[in-house]
């Protein structure tokens, strides 16, 4: 099993990139906008020949301040989000994992996004 606290530390030490995005998303985030991020990050991972990309909720994208998030709190809500997203993406791509962790006593949500299929983008 992957150590998501360690992964977060590695992601957080660097600025955003084509395959890493940070968002505050303190309590809510528009589903359609989430879909656009999913698609863009998935395509960028493919173009950069990476297996996946990352979207992190609960971190201010400009200041890197950890603000925490209550977005989709609980396993049932996260599983429903995975299901809903798979129904709205081509090739039924779905988040590989959506993992809540705690950093500085605040909930942070890490989305592991698979690369889009090769030779399609």
Predicted regions: what is each one?
Residues 1-121:
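Conserved N-terminal catalytic/coupling substructures associated with nucleotide/phosphate chemistry
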């Amino acid at each position: 099993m992957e150590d998501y606290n360690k992964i977060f530390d590695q992601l957080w030490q660097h600025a955003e990139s084509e395959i890493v995005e940070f968002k505050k998303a303190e309590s809510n985030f528009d589903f359609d906008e989430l879909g656009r991020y999913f698609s863009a990050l998935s395509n960028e991972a493919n173009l950069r020949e990476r297996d996946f990309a990352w979207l992190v909720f609960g971190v201010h994208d400009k200041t890197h301040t950890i603000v925490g998030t209550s977005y989709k709190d609980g396993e049932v809500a996260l599983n429903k989000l995975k299901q809903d997203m798979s129904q709205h993406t081509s090739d039924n791509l779905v988040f590989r994992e959506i993992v809540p962790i705690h950093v500085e006593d605040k909930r942070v949500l890490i989305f592991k996004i698979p690369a889009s299929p090769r030779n399609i983008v």
